[in-house]
Amino acid sequence: MSFVDEAKIHVKGGKGGDGCVSFRREKFIEFGGPDGGNGGNGGSVIFIASSAVNTLLYFRYNQHIRAENGKAGSGKGKFGAAGRNRVVEVPVGTQLYDEDGNTLIADLNNIGQQYTVAAGGRGGIGNAQYKSSTNRAPTYFTYGTLGEEHCVLLKLKIVSDVGIIGMPNAGKSSLLSRCTASKTKVSDYPFTTLEPHLGVAYANGCELVLADIPGLIENASSGAGLGHKFLKHIERCVILLHLVDCSLPDIVSAYELVRQELKLHSQELAGKQEVVILNKCDLLSEGEVREKQKLLESSTKKEVITLSMGDELDSLIVFLHAQVKKAVVTEPSDTSFDPFLYVHYNKK
C-alpha cells in the first residue's frame, strides 16, 4: 500500500430541502388552511480521527466528498428528511489547511476527534409556518440553502511514542522489525526505507508505538535525500531514539550531522528527549565497542546504549516506555493534554 501524507480535496455539504406550498383538502372541510411542511437540513461532511487508517490514500481516488441533500417538505405538514452526514475516517495526526496551505483549519491529533469540514444547508420553510391572523392562506415558502463548499489541503503528521532517527543504513528498520510485528523492508543499503513505518511493541505489560522514518543525510532539512519530506512525521513523537552505526569510522560526526538537521528543521524537534543507541555492535570486538561507546558518551554528554543483533529487546522496550511516560508528564501543554496519550499511558 502506498504511503500518502498529502491530499487536496473538494468537500460539499448537502443542500437543504425546499419548503412546500400545500393546502389541506378534505371532504366537508371548505377552508382547510395551509399544511406545507419544511424541508430537511442537508447533511454535513465530517472528518473523524481513527486508528483504523494510517495514510491519506483514500483521498487519492476520492477527491470530491459530498454529503446527502435534504428532502423537500410535503403536504399534510410533513417535514422533509434530513440528508445523511458523510463521515470520513482520517488518520490520527491529520491537519486540515485552506486550499493554499497557509492557514491551519483543524488538527485531528486525538482518536475520535471530529471536525465538520462542510456544514449542510438549512431546510426551507413551508407555507404552514407563515399562517397568521392576517394571512390565513399564505402561498409563499423558502428554498433550502446551499451547503458549505470548500477546497481543503490535508496533511498527515504521524503520532507515535518513539521516533527512530539516524543516518541511512543505521539499522532503524531492523530494530523496528525486531521490536514489533511491522513488516518493513530490510536490506544492507542506504534508503531501504522510502516511507514512514509504524509498529507496536509489547513487553512485560508495556505497549509502545514506534515510527521509523527514512534516514537523514546532510542538508535533509533543505530537501536532500528523503528526510525533508518525512521529518514532520517525528514532530509529534514523544521521544527520539537515535541509532548510530557502530561500524562507521567517525560515529561522532554521524551523530552530530543528524542532530544538526533536526535543529535546522525545528528547534522544538531538536529539543525532544533523546535516547542514543550504538547499533550493530556485533560487527566489532568488545574492546572497540567500549572505546566507541565512551567516545560517543563523551561527545553527547548522554548515556549511550549498545545493541547487537542477538540482544533481547524486552528490557529496551520497558526502558523506552518508562522514558515516554516521564516525557508525557513533563511535556508542554501542546501534548500533555492529548487524551490519546493520557488513556494510552494511564489505562494500567
UniProtKB/Swiss-Prot annotation:
Keywords carried by this UniProt record: Cytoplasm, GTP-binding, Hydrolase, Magnesium, Metal-binding, Nucleotide-binding
Cleavable signal peptide: none
Principal subcellular localisation of the protein: cytoplasm
Domain of life: Bacteria
Amino acids binding GTP: 166-173, 191-195, 212-215, 279-282, 310-312
Entry-linked CDD domains: Obg
A Pfam family: GTP1_OBG
Domain Obg: 1-159
Compartments (UniProt record): Cytoplasm
Binding residues for Mg(2+): S173, T193
InterPro entries: G_OBG, GTP-bd, GTP-bd_Obg/CgtA, GTP1-OBG_CS, GTP1_OBG_dom, GTP1_OBG_dom_sf, OBG_GTPase, P-loop_NTPase
Domain OBG-type G: 160-329
GO cellular component: cytoplasm
Biological process per Gene Ontology, one example term: ribosome biogenesis
Lipoprotein found in the keyword field: no
The EC number(s) this enzyme carries: 3.6.5.-
An MF annotation (GO) of this entry: GTP binding
Cofactor(s) the protein needs: Mg(2+)
Matches recorded under NCBIfam families: Obg_CgtA, PRK12299.1
Function: An essential GTPase which binds GTP, GDP and possibly (p)ppGpp with moderate affinity, with high nucleotide exchange rates and a fairly low GTP hydrolysis rate. Plays a role in control of the cell cycle, stress response, ribosome biogenesis and in those bacteria that undergo differentiation, in morphogenesis control.
Subunit details: Monomer.
Family: Belongs to the TRAFAC class OBG-HflX-like GTPase superfamily. OBG GTPase family.
Listed name of the protein: GTPase Obg 1
Organism listed in the record: Anaplasma marginale (strain St. Maries)
Taxonomic classification: Bacteria, Pseudomonadati, Pseudomonadota, Alphaproteobacteria, Rickettsiales
